[in-house]
């Protein structure tokens, strides 16, 4: 792949500010020592190497990320962001770097429901979500009744807070992409599991301010990585 890499744009050591949330393992999160790690960090480091750019990381909340990138406060945003047409009105997306499907993450001893239909049928069951996210919309329209104000959806500022509420019994379901869901299950020592069929598929992309001249180089690097 050396020949391909030589054909990539050379950004001549340009500093790029990338904003992340550090709250969506295994894509990006803080390890036990407080270091930011994850698949997206590894991918961005490789993209930076191939494009000869220097990455500086900043941190913000999910609800602030798209507006902040849209306004030009940051050059790139990454936190497992689903490529959606409504978001394209505010930001530009890279090509997809990962495809995932929603899974139902529940406590390891859960027996009251086994799939989306049985969860939806039991009015006592609650799900966690972050507002405006793909899991929120999948929960509303594929699991529940299409009412975005359904009181069975409990809102949390971060994905991790929703998972913690699941662990403690404050909610009964978290929807997440399969990559993150499997990561949580593997680390849970049997306290979490995945049930039911996979739900709507989603493609993840990096986000940029509208008209950014970084989209084409990053897309070229993503294609180069995929060819490896």
Name every feature range the model reports, one short phrase each.
Residues 5-80, 89:
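Extracytoplasmic small-molecule ligand-binding "clamshell" domains
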Residues 17, 53-54, 70-79, 124-126, ...:
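Alpha-to-beta junction loops
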Residues 20-24, 58-63, 72-84, 100, ...:
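Beta->alpha turn/N-cap motifs
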Residues 22, 99-106, 178, 186-223:
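Periplasmic-binding protein-like
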Residues 30, 44-52, 116, 134-155, ...:
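Ligand-binding cleft/hinge of the Venus flytrap
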Residues 41, 56-67, 112-114, 153-165, ...:
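Short helix-initiation/N-cap motifs at beta->coil->alpha
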Residues 63-67, 79-90, 138-141, 167-200:
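A ligand-binding cleft/hinge motif common to bilobed small-molecule-binding domains
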Residues 108-126:
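Flexible hinge/capping segments at coil-to-helix
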């Amino acid at each position: 792949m050396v020949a391909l890499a030589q054909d990539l744009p050379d950004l001549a050591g340009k500093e790029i500010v990338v904003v992340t949330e550090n709250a969506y393992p295994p894509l990006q999160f803080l390890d036990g020592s407080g270091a930011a790690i994850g698949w997206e960090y590894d991918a961005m480091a490789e993209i930076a190497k191939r494009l000869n750019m220097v990455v500086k990381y900043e941190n913000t909340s999910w609800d602030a990320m798209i507006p902040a990138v849209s306004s030009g406060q940051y050059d790139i945003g990454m936190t497992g962001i689903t490529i959606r047409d409504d978001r394209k009105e505010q930001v530009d997306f890279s090509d997809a770097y990962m495809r995932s499907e929603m899974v139902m993450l529940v406590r390891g001893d859960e027996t009251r429901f086994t799939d989306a239909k049985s969860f939806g049928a039991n009015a006592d069951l609650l799900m966690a979500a972050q507002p405006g996210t793909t899991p929120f919309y999948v929960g509303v329209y594929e699991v529940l009744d299409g009412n975005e104000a359904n009181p069975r959806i409990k809102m949390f500022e971060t994905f991790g807070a929703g998972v913690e509420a699941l662990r403690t019994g404050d909610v009964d379901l978290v929807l997440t992409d399969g990559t993150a869901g499997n990561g949580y299950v593997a680390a849970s020592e049997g306290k979490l599991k995945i049930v039911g069929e996979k739900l709507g598929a989603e493609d993840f992309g990096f986000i940029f301010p509208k008209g950014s001249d970084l989209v084409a180089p990053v897309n070229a690097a993503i294609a180069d990585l995929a060819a490896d």
